[in-house]
Amino acid sequence: MNFLSIFVLIPLLMLAGLWAAQGIKAIRGVMVTGASALLIASVVLTFMYLGERSAGNTAEMLFRADTLWYAPLHISYSVGVDGISVAMLLLSAIIVFTGTFASWRLQPLTKEYFLWFTLLSMGVFGFFISIDLFTMFMFYEIALIPMYLLIGVWGSGRKEYAAMKLTLMLMGGSAFLLIGILGIYFGSGATTMNLLEIAQLHNIPFAQQCIWFPLTFLGFGVLGALFPFHTWSLDGHASAPTAVSMLHAGVLMKLGGYGCFRIAMYLMPEAANELSWIFLILTGISVVYGAFSACVQTDLKYINAYSSVSHCGLVLFAILMLNQTAATGAILQMLSHGLMTALFFALIGMIYGRTHTRDVRELAGLMKIMPFLSVCYVIAGLANLGLPGLSGFIAEMTIFVGSFQNNDVFHRTLTIIACSSIVITAVYILRLVGKILYGTCTNKHHLTLTDATWDERVAVICLIACVAGLGMAPFWISHMIGESVLPVVSQLIP
């Protein structure tokens, strides 16, 4: 069996184990064992990948395997990874592991919740290892479907509305995506749906590219919170349970940026060059609009949701700059934002579970009441605003340096506008930290609250360690990513 198939096999075994498990201890045991196995497998894969590259293996995709699945449509179970895929698998495993501990005390219907959570995880892992267009689309759909139930059943607030809105908008994006994938396949003249074969043939007519590229980019862009198709994510974040928000913002939204880069831009480079300016304007709006909107929110989850729109917009903004440095920064931003936003949502969930409110106006003085959670919130905020030494700084600096490599007025003007989001982010983060953590607590109930439990500390400490590790030692992963974006970028350079 190919090693990459472990990332699909382990979730399948977890589903079987959860189905048979009786009692909360058995359910937790299955989840911790499975999540730990996925994390170990992702770390092992990272070392295997780096070892292969060090040994001189220059293949575009490593650890490839192809198994014919459905001959009439030339569909194969084709897997393979490069540095981008490895980074995304590592991120996904970290979020699944920490999300398991963040859901440790979830009630009711714990087994059913973890079944859907695991199915969502399987879709994410399967998507990142796939190099067949249809298989990628299949795992993409597997990742989306559980969100409806996870939010609609275990969510809070307007959860039914949020779940339906999310499902309808993402399924609408999937329709665009399916049309785009079929157009790419039939337009390329390829004998399979393997994206490497389609890229090597490089014979999709330009006129067709100009049709399929916008459809494919929009299909993935909806999931990446591209303006003006971002509204589903705001209500989805606000209503989702803690671990689902972590996986949703931390990993699921990254499928959008990954798909735009890996499929839309890689397979249709001429159209990407011709039409990128349209989407650059939209992503520039996403970056600034998300940051400004976060400034006026009073709900902790909505603040982080709008912040995610801004940061995910920066990912798409960077890949549309069509150069290696900016594209490397985009992948680093996916990693950084995935870790930061998972940390934020975990902390917000822990605070809400104690105070039963997410309204900033009702929170104050938490530093004295919950010092551990408060200090962790400060660290998350500093990472979000780009403090040197944490992951946000290296990702954003790489993006802006890469963006300025375009010498024309249009690209540099948009880059300057996008850079303003740094200042805006600092405004809402510092205001938020000052308001809820310091000052005088006026709610007597809050004075009796307890700090983080051991399971919450495990989740939070792991995420902080990753945020700090990426910020202080980014070279190894940025080098791994930079090598892998080069084949895509070389197609994009006119």
What are the residue ranges of the model-derived segments?
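Transmembrane helix-loop-helix hairpins at membrane boundaries of multipass inner-membrane proteins
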Residues: 2-3, 18-101, 105-115, 194, ...
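Hydrophobic alpha-helical transmembrane segments of integral membrane proteins
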Residues: 5, 114-137, 260-263, 464-465, ...
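Central hydrophobic cores of alpha-helical transmembrane segments in multi-pass inner-membrane proteins
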Residues: 5-20, 32-45, 89-103, 120-122, ...
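Alpha-helical transmembrane segments and their helix-start/interface "positive-inside/aromatic belt" motifs
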Residues: 25-37, 161-171, 370-375, 453-462
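Hydrophobic alpha-helical membrane-insertion segments
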Residues: 33-50, 170-181, 373, 377-385, ...
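Membrane-interface helix-loop-helix modules in multi-pass inner-membrane proteins
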Residues: 61-87, 133-136, 140-148, 385, ...
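Hydrophobic transmembrane alpha-helices and their helix-loop junctions in integral membrane proteins
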Residues: 98-104, 122-134, 147-435
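Cytoplasmic/organellar membrane-interface segments at the starts of transmembrane helices
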Residues: 370-372, 429-494
